[in-house]
């Protein structure tokens, strides 16, 4: 398993994200994930820059591969526009770009006032959107008339030498089967060996990528407080992450999440062995590339500590 760094667009502004990308490269991380949001999950996180602009900055600051973790190409932004943005990102990174896609959350997609579809319809829309992406990346003038989208005489003039790989996220059986069908890889946030096996059994041959969060700090008690203050939404059950429409709603729901609940799944504090245990859960589940996000302000401490102690265990070759 390779170890990458997960850039949190919800927690940092664009200049800080570019700086973290630079630090991640210096520390030996394999590649980058970057989240694509219109809103953060709560006001405490406090950021949400336009990911496509940030990717341009990262491309100039580093030589790392960047994957959106993940983009919704179905509601807020038409898939023809995502195809254009992704093609430009692949050109400016000289091919070091992957487009991670998923069926999205109302938190980000409701802002244009469109109806928020049910889960099954969202997957149907995602499948058609990926069809449009691949069509436009073929080059030339293209049109598409489908159930959910129309494209009229569209041509992307600046195309990379090879189309970007599409990494499809999914957390349930239907989404994972779709990922195996239409994707060049699969993205998840859970070290669930059964679901990863399902992806493989359904014919998924590309890499399984995953994202996880840690709060590395010299003070475990302070790290627990930081993780709970900034990311309580990670513990919300069921489909709440997909259907709650605003940061205020997430803040209300997160009042039910205790500090202990967050600390059960987010390793907090200075114990490197505890952090490695979490990483190994993903490796043992069959994850090929794991992207780690450091929660909170102690970014320098994280990179300085992980670069010599943890990163070489995974990225030495």
PLM-predicted stretches and their roles:
Residues 1-317:
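Active-site-adjacent structural elements that line small-molecule/cofactor binding pockets in enzymes
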């Amino acid at each position: 398993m390779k170890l990458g760094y997960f850039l949190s667009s919800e927690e940092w502004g664009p200049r800080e994200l570019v700086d973290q990308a630079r630090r991640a490269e210096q520390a030996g991380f394999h590649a980058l994930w970057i989240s694509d949001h219109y809103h953060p999950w709560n006001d405490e996180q406090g950021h949400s820059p336009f990911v496509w602009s940030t990717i341009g900055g990262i491309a100039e600051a580093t030589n790392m591969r960047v994957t959106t973790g993940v983009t919704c190409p179905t509601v807020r932004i038409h898939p023809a526009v995502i195809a254009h943005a992704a093609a430009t990102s692949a050109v400016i990174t000289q091919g070091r770009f992957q487009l991670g896609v998923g069926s999205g959350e109302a938190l980000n997609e409701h802002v244009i006032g469109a109806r928020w579809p049910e889960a099954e319809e969202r997957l149907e829309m995602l499948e058609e959107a990926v069809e449009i992406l691949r069509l436009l990346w073929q080059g030339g003038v293209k049109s598409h008339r489908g159930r959910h989208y129309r494209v009229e005489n569209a041509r992307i003039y600046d195309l990379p030498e090879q189309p970007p790989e599409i990494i499809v996220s999914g957390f349930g059986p239907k989404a994972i089967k779709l990922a195996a069908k239409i994707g060049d890889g699969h993205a998840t946030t859970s070290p669930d060996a059964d679901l990863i096996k399902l992806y493989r059994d359904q014919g998924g041959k590309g890499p399984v990528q995953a994202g996880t969060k840690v709060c590395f700090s010299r003070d475990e008690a302070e790290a627990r407080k930081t993780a709970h203050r900034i990311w309580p939404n990670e513990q919300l059950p069921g489909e709440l992450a997909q259907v709650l429409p605003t940061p205020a709603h997430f803040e209300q729901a997160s009042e039910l999440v205790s500090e202990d609940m967050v600390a059960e799944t987010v390793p907090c504090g200075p114990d490197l062995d505890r952090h490695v245990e979490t990483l190994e859960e993903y490796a043992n589940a069959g994850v090929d590339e794991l992207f780690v996000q450091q929660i909170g302000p102690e970014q320098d401490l994280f990179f300085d500590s992980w670069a010599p102690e943890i990163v070489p265990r995974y990225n030495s070759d």
